[in-house]
């Protein structure tokens, strides 16, 4: 699974910094946490490696990551940070494992990727003597993956079109008679099969294992009313901003920006949204050593740092202790607040770990037809 959301987070961060919405200091803090590079570590922390290699999704973000967090980290620890922007695709990870040539120390990945490679015996187990189980969401003190932050696929809509009776559920999203207008959905499938099945009458508690053929058939019914399957956060935002789409399933971070930038014209809801974690993994045989990787991952659990990331990007904190530190006027934007979690649906990462590739192939064949 490709972590397009992590790429999008940095685009949002750069945009907010350029607009003066966040200070340079908070920009550096947020960028550092985003890729699990702490700005400060204990002065007596020992490192066995000459460098730490982080793998992300590349492009212009390589230089931005270096400026934002690589230099401060090197100044704090003496360890150079190398950012590999070639992209941690499942194929690239598998190639390193097969060749026994591991070049990445910390990898940003969706949780299902970590679960899948953990089952294959390819990952270092997390060292919970360094990490705190009290600083993760319930059920996420797992063997091979732990969240860095959370995000949601939410239903956003144009309130000028729908007024006081807007679409608020997957059933409404599929009801083109009651809610006319073009739609947009996520190109890489996450949450879209679930939305289709709920619209087709499946109860959220009965979603898994997903009935992929049934979900695809439901999406095919809606295709004439889908203007685009978006592949980037910027694309999803543009479609709604310019009125090409009347509604869409998009990331909550982009929905929040849209609401602000349109003066509330674009609204959105956590009701029956789909909650997903971004997670850290470490391959066995990583050059810097597992202890160093665990020190980095443990450092990202600090609640104050996670609030910096929330305020910069809108990502839900992985550490529940951070919720109380979020300014009161922003808590309604937190996708992992108790109120938001109560009305959302957790994407089943274990199902995705076992079925993602096969299901995605069928999904892409449908959307590209």
Segments and roles (model prediction):
Residues 1-26, 33:
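N-terminal secretory signal peptides
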Residues 151, 213-222, 260-284:
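Periplasmic-binding protein-like
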């Amino acid at each position: 699974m490709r972590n397009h959301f992590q790429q999008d987070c940095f685009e949002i961060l750069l945009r907010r910094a350029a607009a003066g919405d966040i200070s340079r200091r908070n920009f550096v803090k947020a960028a550092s946490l985003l890729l699990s590079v702490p700005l400060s570590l204990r002065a007596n922390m020992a490192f066995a490696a000459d460098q730490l290699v982080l793998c992300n999704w590349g492009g212009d973000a390589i230089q931005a990551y270096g400026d934002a967090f690589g230099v401060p980290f090197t100044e704090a620890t003496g360890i150079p940070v190398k950012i590999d922007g070639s992209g941690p695709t499942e194929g690239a990870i598998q190639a390193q494992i097969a060749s026994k040539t591991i070049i990445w120390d910390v990898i940003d990945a969706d949780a299902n990727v970590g679960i899948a490679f953990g089952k294959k015996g390819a990952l270092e187990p997390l060292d919970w003597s360094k990490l705190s189980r009290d600083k993760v969401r319930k059920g996420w003190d797992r063997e091979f993956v732990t969240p860095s932050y959370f995000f949601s696929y939410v239903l956003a809509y144009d309130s000028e079109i729908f007024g006081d009776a807007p679409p608020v559920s997957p059933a409404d999203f599929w009801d083109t008679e009651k809610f006319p207008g073009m739609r947009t959905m996520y190109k890489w499938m996450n949450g879209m099969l679930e939305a289709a099945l709920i619209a087709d009458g499946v109860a959220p508690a009965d979603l898994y294992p997903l009935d992929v053929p049934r979900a695809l058939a439901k999406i095919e019914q809606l295709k004439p009313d889908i203007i685009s399957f978006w592949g980037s956060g910027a694309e999803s935002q543009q479609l709604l901003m310019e009125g090409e789409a009347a509604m869409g399933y998009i990331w909550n971070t982009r929905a929040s920006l849209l609401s602000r930038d349109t003066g509330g014209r674009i609204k959105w809801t956590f009701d029956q949204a789909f909650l997903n974690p971004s997670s850290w993994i470490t391959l066995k045989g990583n050059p810097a050593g597992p202890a160093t990787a665990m020190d980095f991952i443990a450092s990202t659990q600090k609640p104050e740092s996670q609030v910096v990331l929330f305020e910069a990007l809108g990502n839900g904190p992985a550490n529940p202790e951070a919720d109380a530190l979020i300014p009161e006027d922003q808590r309604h934007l937190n996708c992992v607040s108790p109120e938001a979690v109560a009305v959302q649906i957790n994407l089943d990462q274990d199902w995705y770990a076992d079925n993602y590739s096969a299901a995605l192939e069928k999904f892409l064949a449908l959307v590209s037809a």
